Amino acid sequence: MAGFTMSLNLLLLVAMVATNILSLYHLSSTTNFFQSTVKSSQSSVPTVPDHLLRQLHTIRAAINHLTTHQPDKSTSTSTSRAAVSSSSSSTAPKELLIYSKLSPIASACHNYPDLLHEYMNYTPFSLCPSDTDLVEKLILRGCHPLPRRRCFSRTPRNPSDSKPESNVLWSYYSCKSFDCLITKFSDLGFDLSLEKSKSQFSAYKSELDLPISQLLQIAKSANSVLRLGIDVGGGTGSFAAAMKARNVTVLTTTMNFNAPYSEAVAMRGLVPLHVPLQQRLPVFDGVVDLVRCGRAVNRWIPVTVMEFFFFDLDRILRGGGYLWLDRFFSKKVDLENVYAPMIGKLGYKKVKWAVANKADSKHGEVFLTALLQKPVAR
């Protein structure tokens, strides 16, 4: 900064000397002119030499440039401080930084070079490696959409509608059949029969239940048509299958955590969206009539991410659409102090709000079933 100031002062000094020389030259030329005018009225006015004018313009341009672009001391000081501390701090809101780290965005791929290198280490124009687990590791760490590859995805050798097991690559999973999954995970919906799906959402055993027939009646009474929905964390697509039988199209978001959830959804003739809960839903604004949040949406999601998630649901819901929280799990104190106020920020109408204690609760855990309707106009 001191060198810059010295250079500026030197230029100003040179400019001042040159200006004085030019002024003296011009003054002497003007005096000679008046003297010659007395002697002869026909004498012509002498002009300033071009090389002096060019030098003067050059000096003035340099002075203007330096004075115009000279950085303000306070600005330069703050800029230098920001440059020094950029690696340790930021002026961006903390919640935005948290979300940028947790929410899957493609730019996060560079944060995991080892996993990314392993994912992209394949032979072009051949079969893709068996790396389903690696894919989900990258997705959950923010590397989604995944980089494109020039290899062919693996498929079952002899798929058959009559044999559900033949539609799954079982090498990824501990169980090797749907019977194993039904026995090991009886409550996760791997019984793909339609009657099983219908019965799961038709019974009313407690205040936490919301049968589909009641849901459709509520919508009909409000003159609200249900045509398109999304089941967030919908597992094997049981809810989507039950709604399909009632001519309602429901997309299911799911992840294959040690079981073929996406394959199970597809075998029902439904669409599985292989996305985590943190991702912005790949759906246009204001086009969905219903969003159901299953048991995957609960208190284990970080609070800040949960708030972004709710507002993304609001983004895709149309005015008059419904948000259904089906057995949202949390501690009672957290529901009252954190989640209920967070949900209240949406400004939705409470059509149903039922809270019940967890049967074997030891720390005050509760379940919430809520049906909320988005305002028609903000």
Swiss-Prot record:
GO terms for molecular function: methyltransferase activity. Residues 67-87 are annotated as: Disordered. It holds the Pfam family Methyltransf_29. GO terms for biological process: methylation. Glycans are attached at residue 247. Its main location: Golgi. Its EC number is 2.1.1.-. Residues 1-6 are cytoplasmic. It comes from the Eukaryota. Keywords: Glycoprotein, Golgi apparatus, Membrane, Methyltransferase, Signal-anchor, Transferase, Transmembrane, Transmembrane helix. Residues 74-87 have a biased composition (Low complexity). This is Probable methyltransferase At1g29790. It comes from Arabidopsis thaliana. The gene is CLSC5.
